[in-house]
Amino acid sequence: WYTENRIPKLSEVRGKIILFNRVGELSIGINASKDWTQNGFSSIEHRDFRLNIQDCYKLGSVEEGWKVAKEYFHTLTKESDGKKNLSINFHSGILSLPNVSKVAQHVNTEFIKYAKTQARHFGIAVFDFINPEICNIVISANSQ
């Protein structure tokens, strides 16, 4: 486990689970408890780093799930003001009737097509029903 409140180097966390803390009373893990917007976008400021989060999960259509995730990719930035940025982009969602697999099938297919045409990092990309192809794409892109 990695339980510090800072963005680690890859060598520090290889093979470990990184704990994100969304409970303000706890002082363990990367603190994401303040200002995490439910069903929206968040930017959580820390002294030395910033967490940027897209967590839109209440969707009007399966197409909206991919549209939101794709637009968020275009906002990802690397360090620009002396602070490290850690981006988390959720690729999951529900429709009026929870049909997670239907949303995931569409979003995952669109992500694979999109990623094959992009030369960019994706930050932390959270998927429902992930497959080996998506894993390889994200790992490869983030190591550029």
Task: Give the positions of each predicted feature.
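Catalytic cores of phosphodiester-bond hydrolases, prominently lipid phosphodiesterases
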Residues: 1-144
